[in-house]
């Protein structure tokens, strides 16, 4: 009985203390609300031109904020969409495709490996089968696109991110080289939001497991967050198992009232087994490459490569991906630091330096590739917040320099599996340098009208040398040297107007320009798909016009619509010459990219939300003739008016969400998501098209207030649709007997193009916070 009485007494004390704590907390909240209301009233009474009062705080406040003009967040003068982590927090988020496809104007395809993703903004990367080209990619405003123009997403785990910013349209005035399509910035979660330790595990079909954790905290002068994960899976397609580990950390520290530093670290290492890209007919016969262990007894539709028996020349034999053990083993290390200093309350100087090392070992085909690509990126700029002619103005000027040291090797493959490297076929040594200046002015003409103008100028230098080796049977090896010493000068202006017509409607119009020099790998592959001289490629450029509107009615309705029209010159188009050959690149003199982008977020009832993004892309050649050759027969074909291959004309993503807003089941919810992709061509002649498809995803989750514990279950591709997940652009060919192009029935046998998309997959995950 004594124990019972003691328990009752303790319970009474706890309950009374809890009640007292609640009363105290309520009083504090009411006091804070009164202070906020008073400050808002003071702002309403102040003149529109009054400068903003500097942020002040008590010793417990966290005020480690940058004052320089951000490259990618809260962007003015661009067409931009931000995706918060509430859209993907309770989903599998196995790749960044699960995030960026929620933005209008963005399409995604599977890349070279289970974690690799090809990302296109307005079709920017549609002719490339992996990674991202023709856009700039950042993490926390640190560059992760190397100076050769390539960004890859194997190193990213979406669980690390709190938001993603997608900037659409030509943007070289702001981002420099390769920003023809725009930019993407991944923002890691902040220490103040984590405030402790979070641990989680996801599991799913085909052996998928993701173990991840985050630690974060913030204090009066510092803030940090560190994320780590280990992911593995067997893959639905044969020979696509993988395992990869990621570390991603970001921290800031205020040295004083006027000085701040930030540090960024990313490390990723992964081992990814790869299937052979199929022809369309192979895909139809065996989409997931099952029964393909041995070429001699392989099932119908199995893809193979052809390797020299001796690794040098002579007789070749066929090998499946299993026999050749095709794979990628890549390591990426990025370390960056940023320093900001305030010259008074209006002017900030910022300097940033980033080291980026990419070490690759890629026996992915009959010509394995190894290389080390180390790069350095330095920027320094000044931002001033002041007034010009009585108008609020933000002025920006900056310098930038980046450098890539390329050391790469290609080999013939032998039959000896993953480490079967035979005779050397080429080496590429050299460097790429980019040096430039950019300036920007943002003027608040009236409280509702803003004018933005910017310009960037850049000098780029490519100094590379290829040494190519061939091994004729019964003769001495032949060595050929191909130098590529190229200089490029590019200037990119832009201007934009934003007009807040009413409290709910904002209109914008923008003219932007972009440019991108050839990548070093494109300079050394001929149209025959072999190593050789292709160093006369030109830089591609574009000029684009955006016109659009944004509607925001409280938290109930947010919508955006943008129409764009872009003129391209010397567009770089890559094509596959076959599974045993290298992809080659050519310039297209003139082409047009135009389309419409729509985004919607509507909350018709408490707890309900309808999200949708729609992209329409009409991209076509206006001046392009292509020569095809077969033996002694050669013919030229006009591609004028043809759709640019690889570009998906219509892409729709819609999600209907319900989350219980109150009561004991608050945080319980789910959504149904539908994705539609239109039919698209994969050749310049527009003869072979990949079929359209629709996917349906189902999600249930429980994420209560406080987020101490959450869980989800998800079914991706609910109806188990078989679809083309990725299709590299293929080359057209000529019938020597007729002098005509070979039809779709022949192109359907061209290998080296297609990966099937993921079949029905079930996931579940749980997270806990301490």
Residue ranges and their predicted role:
Residues 65, 72, 97-142:
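Extracytoplasmic beta-strand/coil segments of soluble accessory domains associated
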Residues 96-99, 118-122, 135-139, 152-154, ...:
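N-terminal periplasmic accessory domains that precede
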Residues 142-168, 291:
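Short acidic/polar hinge/loop motifs at secondary-structure boundaries
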Residues 196, 203-232, 237-279, 285, ...:
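Transmembrane beta-barrel wall of Gram-negative outer-membrane proteins
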Residues 260-266, 326-472, 482, 498-500, ...:
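Face-selective signature of the C-terminal outer-membrane beta-barrel domain
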Residues 348-354, 360, 500, 506-512, ...:
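Membrane-embedded beta-barrel scaffold of Gram-negative outer-membrane proteins
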Residues 459-460, 564-568, 586-683, 767-769:
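Gram-negative outer-membrane beta-barrel transporters
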Residues 513, 675-681, 702-770:
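C-terminal beta-signal and adjacent terminal beta-strands/loops
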